[in-house]
């Protein structure tokens, strides 16, 4: 794509993702092609950044918060997170506990739902 202008690429180094600008569209220097499965997966994750998510955990708790990042172990960081205990717990009485910034271990995640942008249909995908 000649003349397409600079693009933002993500590069993973030592377990961390960093952005860099590139003026070529031939792929990055590691041989990862622009339409490779890894690139498509990364783009899908980028599209979810700052979206509200509901994460169900193995112990029955549910966390709702803003998706900030993930890592290679599938751990998820949520901002402005709230914790909802399982309904059978009489102490919780359905009220959320405000956590703020929360790290959810990947091996404890049962399901992840992303809140829809529009109000049509259900609130989560």
UniProtKB/Swiss-Prot annotation:
- Disordered, as annotated region: 1-42
Q: Output a single Gene Ontology CC term carried by this record.
A: nucleus
Q: Which domain of life is it from?
A: Eukaryota
Q: Which InterPro entries match?
A: LSM_dom_sf, LSMD1_Sm, Sm, Sm_dom_euk/arc, snRNP_SmB/NAA38-like
- MF terms in GO: RNA binding
Main localization is: cytoplasm
Gene3D superfamilies found in the cross-reference section: 2.30.30.100
Please report the stretch or stretches of sequence annotated as the Sm domain: 40-118
Q: Modified residue Phosphoserine is at which positions?
A: 22, 25, 29
- State where the protein is found: Cytoplasm; Nucleus
Pfam families registered for this protein in UniProt: LSM (PF01423)
Q: Which GO terms describe its biological process?
A: negative regulation of apoptotic process
Q: Where is the composition biased (Low complexity)?
A: 18-28
For the modification N-acetylalanine, the affected residues are 2
Name the keywords, alphabetized: Acetylation, Cytoplasm, Nucleus, Phosphoprotein
Q: How does it assemble?
A: Component of the N-terminal acetyltransferase C (NatC) complex, which is composed of NAA35, NAA38 and NAA30.
Q: Which family does it belong to?
A: Belongs to the snRNP Sm proteins family.
The job of this chain, per UniProt, is described as:
Auxillary component of the N-terminal acetyltransferase C (NatC) complex which catalyzes acetylation of N-terminal methionine residues. N-terminal acetylation protects proteins from ubiquitination and degradation by the N-end rule pathway.
Name of this chain's protein: N-alpha-acetyltransferase 38, NatC auxiliary subunit
- Organism equals Mus musculus (Mouse)
């Amino acid at each position: 794509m000649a003349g397409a202008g600079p693009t933002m690429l993500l590069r993973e180094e030592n377990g961390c993702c960093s952005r860099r600008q590139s003026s070529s569209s031939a792929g990055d220097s590691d041989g990862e092609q622009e339409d490779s499965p890894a690139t498509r997966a990364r783009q899908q994750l980028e599209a979810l950044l700052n979206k509200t998510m509901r994460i169900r955990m193995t112990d029955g708790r549910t966390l709702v918060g803003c998706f900030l990042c993930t890592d290679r172990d599938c751990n998820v960081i949520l901002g402005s997170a709230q914790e909802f205990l399982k309904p059978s717990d009489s102490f919780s009485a359905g009220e959320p506990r405000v956590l703020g910034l929360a790290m959810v271990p990947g091996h404890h995640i049962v399901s992840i739902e992303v809140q829809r942008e529009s109000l049509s249909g259900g609130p989560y995908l």
